[in-house]
Amino acid sequence: MPTYRSRTTTEGRNMAGARALWRATGMTDGDFQKPIIAVVNSFTQFVPGHVHLKDLGQLVAGEIAAAGGVAKEFNTIAVDDGIAMGHDGMLYSLPSREIIADSVEYMVNAHCADAMVCISNCDKITPGMLMAALRLNIPTVFVSGGPMEAGKVKLGDGEHALDLVDAMVMAADDSVSEEDIELVERSACPTCGSCSGMFTANSMNCLTEALGLSLPGNGSVLATHSDRQNLFKRAGHLIVDLAKRYYEGDDESVLPRSVATYDAFENAMTLDISMGGSTNTVLHLLAAAHEAGVDFTMQDIDQLSRRVPVLCKVAPAKNDVHMEDVHRAGGIMGILGELDRAGLLKTDVSTVHAPSMSAALNEWDVVRNENHHEFYRAAPGGIPTVFAFSQSRRYRELDTDREAGVIRSAEHAFSQDGGLAVLYGNLAEDGCIVKTAGVDESILKFSGPARVFESQDASVDAILSGEVKEGEVVLIRYEGPRGGPGMQEMLYPTSYLKSKGLGKACALVTDGRFSGGSSGLSIGHVSPEAAEGGTIGLVETGDLIEIDIPNRTIHLAVPDAELAARRQKREEEGWHPAEPRPRKITAALRAYASMTTSASRGAVRNI
């Protein structure tokens, strides 16, 4: 029978000092025999996805106390990728994932907490906390802050739904008036919550449902809706139950590593492919699997991508569909239900809230059970706000149309080819990733001359000045985990290509990564990266690059002898950008670069 970890600090004569300190936090004699639950919050006023979390930790804490536990809250950092985008701030985004994971480990292990509720939301916070949960392997429940409502704006022929990416694209389009840009800017992000499309934050929060570590609705209930309050309350009660089942009942099935097994990771990736999730999820799932000791690799993702269809298209792949629409169609449990009916889901895996995924789907899939139809009718309020649970509006009816609705059955899939693909070839021997759900069918096969840039900044200048021409492959290198360092997101280059009318006329290839808001023929995570001696570091402007998504290949059409000669020269001169970059690399970033690994391994640390 496992012993409560917290008893290390609450029992025995030699812990009198520790108990004295616990008492100073408000604990009483009766509390020392209760499970101590860490409430891992990530409130910050810098990030709209986290601005409303300030009081939610204490909401969970109150429920933990009511259920017989003791809650102790602390905070992690949280970087807003949208605000950090387009300047050196983005160098810190991916490294913050490791800092978050470490900070959770430090706090939980230093104070011997028995279990955790992780209150996350945005891009690197959910992955960082997920890595920590699997590293620590103590009972854990995830509950996120929830998606933002989609913006609404009246332009031209009527009202349009929009999001952050629309504002970025329009701002770079010279044909759009200053007045319209201001209107879109003021309308794109109307409420608190994670950005409203299937970007990285929402993708990861959805995947926690598939992994079995969060409650149904975690990925799709709007931040503003009162139904999300119930998720926080239920999480508080659930975590105490899980802690008692483990420490008092020796039930190891509730532990994160027992829930997030290889099959669960397959389910999560299957979901991601079926809904065209962010390519960043590949990076984060690989890192989480590493922490869990699960042998889940790029090769597994490649195999899944070849047999999982696209059942749901959400912005940026489909501009008029946002997370509120996914929820109305049955949320993540609705998509998982369709995957199950197609024979693509492992349903004997356990979850924190149900004995199996099969049992969870029997209860929460709107097609097979009407018990929670009201829950999935939760609608946006349409009123700008920074407050959680501020409205209770509901749609009159659900979207259960599986032929032409937001969520499709496998028979009526948007595409039988999955929403993500892994490409291999001499340009990416260890693989690279493309979000096929955002690629127009006309350019699934694409060949063109490379236009090489040694940084994201240089590519942006060239795109905006009109130097990049139709048919070219924009190649941005030395932006990988080590070369950046920090593996910047390339949302600005992809957005600016769209604004210049080149979204379907050019490709973009990089050893960096892409925002979940990116679309078009955007190929990232090229591995090995340039800074590690990857072939991407040998490409010269004018070289022909051949991309074949249906056959999963990417090829640099340069003779092997020429590549060998270029490699010898590069080995002599060093693997670094050919042109100097005005980029300040601090000691913190240098430390990250010295330990990080390739994107094909999830950019985990090699220590």
Swiss-Prot record:
Q: Which UniProt keywords apply?
A: 2Fe-2S, Amino-acid biosynthesis, Branched-chain amino acid biosynthesis, Iron, Iron-sulfur, Lyase, Magnesium, Metal-binding
Which residues in this protein are found as N6-carboxylysine?
A: K124
Molecular function GO terms recorded: 2 iron, 2 sulfur cluster binding; dihydroxy-acid dehydratase activity; hydro-lyase activity; magnesium ion binding
EC number per UniProt:
4.2.1.9
Listed binding positions for Mg(2+) are D81, D123, K124, E489
The record, for InterPro entries, names: Dihydro-acid_dehy_C, DihydroxyA_deHydtase, DiOHA_6PGluconate_deHydtase_CS, ILV_EDD_C, ILV_EDD_N, IlvD/EDD_N
- What does the entry comment about cofactor binding? Binds 1 [2Fe-2S] cluster per subunit. This cluster acts as a Lewis acid cofactor.
The cofactors it requires, by name, are: [2Fe-2S] cluster; Mg(2+)
Q: Where does [2Fe-2S] cluster bind?
A: C122, C195
Catalysed reactions, semicolon-separated:
(2R)-2,3-dihydroxy-3-methylbutanoate = 3-methyl-2-oxobutanoate + H2O; (2R,3R)-2,3-dihydroxy-3-methylpentanoate = (S)-3-methyl-2-oxopentanoate + H2O
Q: What is an annotated GO biological process for this record, any one?
A: L-valine biosynthetic process
Q: Which domain of life is it from?
A: Bacteria
Active site: which residues?
A: S515 (proton acceptor)
Looking at the UniProt record for this protein, which Gene Ontology cellular component terms does it annotate, in alphabetical order? cytosol
Subunit description: Homodimer.
Q: What's its job?
A: Functions in the biosynthesis of branched-chain amino acids. Catalyzes the dehydration of (2R,3R)-2,3-dihydroxy-3-methylpentanoate (2,3-dihydroxy-3-methylvalerate) into 2-oxo-3-methylpentanoate (2-oxo-3-methylvalerate) and of (2R)-2,3-dihydroxy-3-methylbutanoate (2,3-dihydroxyisovalerate) into 2-oxo-3-methylbutanoate (2-oxoisovalerate), the penultimate precursor to L-isoleucine and L-valine, respectively.
Family, per the entry?
A: Belongs to the IlvD/Edd family.
Q: What is this protein called?
A: Dihydroxy-acid dehydratase
